[in-house]
């Protein structure tokens, strides 16, 4: 598999938009890419470089035909004030009934994530807690998983 990933024909990247500086999907329809490659990874949306996000009503945009969803949560936002760690903090606070200046606890983040996943009917989505190496309190990952009520992949992806 590692050799296949290094092969030029087995990986694609999006097209850089010179006006926005953002990557967009390639010209080929995703269905065609899915027929040509074993895996097609799509970032559904961004979070303005913040570790946590409350999604707007139209997000995330999930392409039709998606087989698996991995919802990534930035652990570096746990234990920080919501107004510093969350993209769209007002929506986040609306969903968990708290103030902007309170701490983004594992329980609050799980409450918001559960509400969003339920609204999108994503009961089979997997959840990855990334950046666990940044946690000052390692029990936060366990608390997040317990509050979420489903298994969580806790990791620190580098690079």
Task: Go through each PLM region and give its residues.
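N-terminal phosphate/diphosphate-binding loop that engages ATP/GTP or pyrophosphate donors
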Residues: 1-20
């Amino acid at each position: 598999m590692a050799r296949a990933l290094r092969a030029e024909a087995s990986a694609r990247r999006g097209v850089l938009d010179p006006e926005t500086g953002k990557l967009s999907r390639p010209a080929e329809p995703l269905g065609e890419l899915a027929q040509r490659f074993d895996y097609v990874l799509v970032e559904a949306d961004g979070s303005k470089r913040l570790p946590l996000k409350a999604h707007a009503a139209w997000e995330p945009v999930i392409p039709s035909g998606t087989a698996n969803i991995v919802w990534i949560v930035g652990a570096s936002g746990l234990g920080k004030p919501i107004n510093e760690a969350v993209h769209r903090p007002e929506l986040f606070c609306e969903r968990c009934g708290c103030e902007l200046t309170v701490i983004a606890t594992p329980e609050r983040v799980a409450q918001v994530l559960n509400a969003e996943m339920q609204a999108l009917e994503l009961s089979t989505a997997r959840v990855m807690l990334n950046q666990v190496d940044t946690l000052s309190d390692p029990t936060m990952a366990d608390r997040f998983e317990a509050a979420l009520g489903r298994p969580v992949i806790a990791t620190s992806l580098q690079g």
